[in-house]
C-alpha cells in the first residue's frame, strides 16, 4: 500500500499553477488513459494437494459465478454456504474453505483470484492472495491511468513484482541473506511471468453440470485404497467416470438434451476400505509381518488381504455393514439435498466390490418384508415342501403304471434318487423306463440353483435349512441366512431403496460362486429387489469371469461385444475378422478344387459312344460336382447366420437379456495381452465404451435412446 499512497501523493503534489492549457490537456489525457482501464474479472479457485504439491484448480464457470454473486451481495457473507460441483461440495464463503458433502476428505482452501504468477517447476499459474491481488490491481490502475510504468512492489514474502507495461510484468524471488541494500531484482535469478485475469492464463474452465439429476449410481471399489495404476482413490476415479459421462451425454444424447428430456447421471463413490482398516487389524498384521521385502509385504497387507478379510465372518460383517450403511446414508443425504429428485437408483461395483454387492442383493427382501411370500415374484428354487411328489414325477414322465411297484417296494423320491440301473432292473422296471427315470433324477440332481433363505424361527435364532437344490455342500449355522451360494454366515443389512440395475466391472463373481460350490444358477432366479445385471469386463482382465455359462452350462456362446463409442468395431478387430473370413473362403475353395480334381482323377473313363451320345450329361456332371462345395458352404453360412440371429435364453438374472458384455481391446493391447493384463483390470474408470453402455441402459429404462444406435 505504501507505493499506492506515494503515487497518490505525487498526484496531489503536482504543480499548483499549471499553464492555461495544461489542465484541459491533462483531463484529455486522463480520459483517454482511463478509458483503457477496465476492472479485472475475478474467478474462484480451490487448492488441492496432488503428489504432495499444492495445485490450484478453477471452479467451473457456473460455480464461480454463484460464488461471486454471493460475495458481491455482502449479506451474511461470513455464514454463507454455496453448493458447488453438482452439489457434491459446499463452500463456506466466510472461511474460504471447501468441504466434501458425501464422503470424508480434507477441506481445501478457496480463493477469489485476479492476479497470477507462473510456478517454479511447471507452467501452471498460481494465484496471489486476495489482499495482495488488490494491491496489484490498484497499482495497475494507477499505472494505466497515468501511463507511468516500471512500478515496483514488494510482497509480504519480500518478493519483488515489477510492472514494466501492460504486457510485461515479472516476479522476482528474494535472495537468501540479502537485505534492503542488497542486490537489485535483476540479479535475483530468473524472473517469473505475472498475468492479470484468468483469461490470460492457460487453464481449462468447464461450463458446469446440468442441475437436473435423472439417476443416481453408487460405485463400490475393489481391493486396496488405490483404484488405478496412478494410485488414485475411489473418489478421484469416480470423478473421471462422471466427467466421461457428461461428455458422452453431449455427444450421444444431444437430441434429448436439446429437448430438455435429460439432465445427467450422478455417480457417488462408496468407500469401505478405510473403515475396515481402522479397526486395528493393520496393527495386528504389522506385528506378525516379516521385516524383509517391506514394501511388497505392506502392499499385500493393504490390498490383497482384503479378499481374505471378506471370507472371514468377522471382517465380512464389517465390510457388508459399511457398504450397505454408507449407501443408505448417502441416499438419505442425497434426498435431503435434492428434494425434487424423482429418478431411480443403480449400483456398480469394481472387482471385489461387485461381489460384495452381489451378496448384498442376493440377501435382500422385497417390499412385503416376508421372504416366504416372495415365491411368485422371485421365481427361484422352492423348498422341499413345494417339490413335486414321486407320483407327479412319474406322471410327468408318462410312467404312472410303475408307481404301484415303487409303492410296494417302499421307494420314495429320496430312495429312488439313490437307485442304480441294476436296482431298478431287479424290481422289474423295463430298460426304457429305467433310462427315463435315471436321466430325470440325474438332471434334477445336477440342476443346482440358488436356494431361498430359510424362514426365521420364532425364537429369533436363525438356523439355515438345506434345500434339495442347495448349491453348497456345507451347512453353516450362523446369525442370519445361508442362501446356498457359500457366503460366510453374516447378517446382511437391508437397503432402503430398490436398485434398478447392477453393473459389475472386472468382476470375479463367477469364480467365487464356483469356489463356493455353486455349479449352476437357476435360469428363473433373479435378485429380489434388482431387475438388471450387467457383467462388464475387458478381454484381458485377469480378475474377470463370466456369468452366463453358469446359467446355461450346456451351451457355448460368445459374450456380447460392447460397441465402440464412435460406432462400429475397432479397425484392427475388423481387419482380423476380415482376414479370418478370407482365409476360410480360400480354404474352402482350395478344398473344393482338390476334391474335384481327385474325383476326376479316380473316376472311371466313360465309353466313347456314351460320351458322344450324352454330351450334356457329361458337361452337367462336373458342374453339379463343383456346385456341391459351394452348396455346403452356403448351408454352413446360413446356419451360422441363423445361430447368430437366434436369441439365447440366459435366464432372468438380467430380465431375459444378455449378462456378459466384453470390451474391445485397443490395437496396442492386442500385441501382448500379458503386458496389459493389470492395466486391463483398471481401465474401466476412463473407458468411454463402458460409460456409454451404463448410460444407454439407464436411460433405456426411461424410454430415452441414443441419437444413433451403435453397431
Swiss-Prot record:
Changing residue 435 to A: Loss of phospholipid binding and of Golgi/ERGIC localization. The active site is at 351 (nucleophile). Keywords: Cytoplasm, Disease variant, Golgi apparatus, Hereditary spastic paraplegia, Hydrolase, Lipid degradation, Lipid metabolism, Neurodegeneration, Phosphoprotein. Residues 495-700 form the DDHD domain. Residues 30-112 form the WWE domain. The modification Phosphoserine is found at residue 447. Transmembrane segments: none annotated. It comes from the Eukaryota. The keyword Transferase does not apply. SAM and DDHD domains together are required for phospholipid binding. Forms homooligomers and, to a much smaller extent, heterooligomers with DDHD1. This is Triacylglycerol hydrolase DDHD2. It comes from Homo sapiens (Human). The gene is DDHD2.
Amino acid at each position: 500500500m505504501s507505493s499506492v499512497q506515494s503515487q497518490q501523493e505525487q498526484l496531489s503534489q503536482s504543480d499548483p499553477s499549471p499553464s492555461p492549457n495544461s489542465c484541459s490537456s491533462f483531463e484529455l489525457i486522463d480520459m483517454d488513459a482511463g478509458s483503457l482501464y477496465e476492472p479485472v474479472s475475478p474467478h474462484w479457485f480451490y487448492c488441492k494437494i496432488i503428489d504432495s504439491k499444492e495445485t490450484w484448480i478453477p471452479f467451473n464457470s457456473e460455480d464461480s459465478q454463484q460464488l461471486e454473486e454471493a460475495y458481491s451481495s455482502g449479506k451474511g457473507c461470513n455464514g454463507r454456504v454455496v453448493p458447488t460441483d453438482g452439489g457434491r461440495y459446499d463452500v463456506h464463503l466466510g472461511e474460504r474453505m471447501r468441504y466434501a458433502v458425501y464422503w470424508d476428505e480434507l477441506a481445501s482452501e478457496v480463493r477469489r483470484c485476479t492476479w497470477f504468477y507462473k510456478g517454479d517447476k511447471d507452467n501452471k499459474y498460481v494465484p496471489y492472495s486476495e489482499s495482495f491481488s488488490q494491491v496489484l490491481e490498484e497499482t495497475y490502475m494507477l499505472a494505466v491511468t497515468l501511463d507511468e510504468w516500471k512500478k515496483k512492489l514488494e510482497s509480504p514474502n519480500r518478493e519483488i513484482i515489477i510492472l514494466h507495461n501492460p504486457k510485461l510484468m515479472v516476479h522476482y524471488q528474494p535472495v537468501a541473506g540479502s537485505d534492503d541494500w542488497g542486490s537489485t531484482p535483476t540479479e535475483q535469478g530468473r524472473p517469473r511471468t505475472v498475468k492479470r485475469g484468468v483469461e490470460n492464463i492457460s487453464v481449462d474452465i468447464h461450463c458446469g453440470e446440468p442441475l437436473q439429476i435423472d439417476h443416481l449410481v453408487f460405485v463400490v471399489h475393489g481391493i486396496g485404497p488405490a483404484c488405478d495404476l496412478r494410485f488414485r482413490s475411489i473418489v478421484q476415479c469416480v470423478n473421471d467416470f462422471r466427467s466421461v459421462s457428461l461428455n458422452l451425454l453431449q455427444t450421444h444424447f444431444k437430441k434429448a438434451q436439446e429437448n430438455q428430456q435429460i439432465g445427467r447421471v450422478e455417480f457417488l463413490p462408496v468407500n469401505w476400505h478405510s473403515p475396515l482398516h481402522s479397526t486395528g487389524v493393520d496393527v495386528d498384521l504389522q506385528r506378525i509381518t516379516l521385516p524383509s521385502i517391506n514394501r511388497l509385504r505392506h502392499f499385500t497387507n493393504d490390498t490383497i488381504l482384503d479378499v481374505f478379510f471378506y471370507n472371514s465372518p468377522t471382517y465380512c460383517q464389517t465390510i457388508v455393514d459399511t457398504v450397505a450403511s454408507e449407501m443408505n446414508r448417502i441416499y438419505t443425504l442425497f434426498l435431503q439435498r435434492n428434494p425434487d429428485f424423482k429418478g431411480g437408483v443403480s449400483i456398480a461395483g469394481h472387482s471385489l466390490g461387485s461381489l460384495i454387492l452381489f451378496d448384498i442383493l442376493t440377501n435382500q427382501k422385497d417390499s412385503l418384508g416376508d421372504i416366504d411370500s416372495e415365491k411368485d415374484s422371485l421365481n427361484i428354487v422352492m423348498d422341499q415342501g413345494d417339490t413335486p411328489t414321486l407320483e407327479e414325477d412319474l406322471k410327468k414322465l408318462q410312467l404312472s403304471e410303475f408307481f404301484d411297484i415303487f409303492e410296494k417296494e417302499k421307494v420314495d423320491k429320496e430312495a429312488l434318487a439313490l437307485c442304480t440301473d441294476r436296482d431298478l432292473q431287479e424290481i422289474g422296471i423295463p430298460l426304457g423306463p429305467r433310462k427315463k427315470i435315471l436321466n430325470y433324477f440325474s438332471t434334477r440332481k445336477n440342476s443346482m440353483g440358488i436356494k431361498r433363505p430359510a424362514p426365521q424361527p420364532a425364537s429369533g435364532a436363525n438356523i439355515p435349512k438345506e434345500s434339495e437344490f442347495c448349491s453348497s455342500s456345507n451347512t453353516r449355522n450362523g446369525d442370519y441366512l445361508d442362501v446356498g451360494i457359500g457366503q460366510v454366515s453374516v447378517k446382511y443389512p437391508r437397503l432402503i431403496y430398490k436398485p434398478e440395475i447392477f453393473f459389475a466391472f472386472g468382476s470375479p463373481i463367477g469364480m467365487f460362486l464356483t469356489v463356493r460350490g455353486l455349479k449352476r444358477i437357476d435360469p428363473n432366479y433373479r435378485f429380489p429387489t434388482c431387475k438388471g445385471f450387467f457383467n462388464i469386463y475387458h478381454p484381458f482382465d485377469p480378475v474377470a469371469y463370466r456369468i452366463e455359462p453358469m446359467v446355461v452350462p450346456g451351451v457355448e456362446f460368445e459374450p456380447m461385444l460392447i460397441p465402440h463409442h464412435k460406432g462400429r468395431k475397432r479397425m484392427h478387430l475388423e481387419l482380423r475378422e476380415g482376414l479370418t473370413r478370407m482365409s476360410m473362403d480360400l480354404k474352402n475353395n482350395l478344398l473344393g478344387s482338390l476334391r474335384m480334381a481327385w474325383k476326376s482323377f479316380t473316376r472311371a473313363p466313360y465309353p466313347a459312344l456314351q460320351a458322344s451320345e450324352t454330351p450334356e450329361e457329361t458337361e452337367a456332371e462336373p458342374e453339379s460336382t463343383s456346385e456341391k462345395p459351394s452348396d455346403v458352404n452356403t448351408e454352413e453360412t446360413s446356419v451360422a447366420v441363423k445361430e447368430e440371429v437366434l436369441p439365447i435364453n440366459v435366464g432372468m438374472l438380467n430380465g431375459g437379456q444378455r449378462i456378459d458384455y466384453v470390451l474391445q481391446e485397443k490395437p496396442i493391447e492386442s500385441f501382448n495381452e500379458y503386458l496389459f493384463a493389470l492395466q486391463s483390470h483398471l481401465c474401466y474408470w476412463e473407458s468411454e465404451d463402458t460409460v456409454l453402455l451404463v448410460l444407454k441402459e439407464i436411460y433405456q429404462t426411461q424410454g430415452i435412446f441414443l441419437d444413433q444406435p451403435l453397431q
